[in-house]
């Protein structure tokens, strides 16, 4: 798995200053929650900094990644990066950063949530909403 500095730099290069600052705030909040709920702070830090890596992709980039990684998007997700970025971001993190399945799920569901979320998923979900 890539280290924090490598992921930080890669995410920073792909996002606007405003979106990157949001990722920093989300990370800080998520680490606070990780301390409270006994989750791995380093893992949380990596997930949170990378959670929006796909948020500002162009439609062309989305199409390319969907084809490359065989990502299923429904019709609404295809037209709305606000919904699809979490799925696409999870796949980017899996293949480019070597995130494990648990980390990828936290990214995949950080926008919509889901039933029976793990503590890690909840931390990222809430930190994103409040960060």
What kind of feature is each model-predicted range?
Residues 22:
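N-terminal glycine-rich anion-binding loops that anchor highly charged ligand groups
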Residues 1-4:
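Non-catalytic terminal extensions that flank enzyme cores
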